[in-house]
Amino acid sequence: MPSKLALIQELPDRIQTAVEAAMGMSYQDAPNNVRRDLDNLHACLNKAKLTVSRMVTSLLEKPSVVAYLEGKAPEEAKPTLEERLRKLELSHSLPTTGSDPPPAKL
């Protein structure tokens, strides 16, 4: 069975093949309303082909997506909850300096 990455990489070619097969259908002898509907289908297929190609290109430019598709654990770009809590605790436990204004008197 092909890898997830290989399946994604093959999508534009598979779509291209399917679109070419559909575009190869002859329908010039069809009634006008059918011909119009099939013309709309061709336009939709061409747009789908471009959309899939752009999306696959965009996905394969992202290292985290490629790592996932290859079965690797992607590196965490965001800090973990523990790191964020530790940072928050440190920011609240810093000693005050002499430049801080005195607390307000009530």
UniProtKB/Swiss-Prot annotation:
GO BP of this protein: symbiont-mediated suppression of host innate immune response
Tagged with keyword RNA-binding: yes
GO molecular function ontology, one term from the record: RNA binding
RNA-binding recorded as keyword: yes
Domain comment (free text): The dsRNA-binding region is required for suppression of RNA silencing. The N-terminus is involved in homodimerization. The alpha2 helices of the dimer bind parallel to the stem of the dsRNA helix.
Subunit structure: Homodimer. Interacts with RNA-directed RNA polymerase.
Family according to the record: Belongs to the nodaviridae B2 protein family.
General remark: Encoded on a subgenomic RNA (RNA3) synthesized during replication and which is co-terminal with RNA1.
Protein's name in the database: Protein B2
Record organism: Flock house virus
Organism ancestry: Viruses, Riboviria, Orthornavirae, Kitrinoviricota, Magsaviricetes
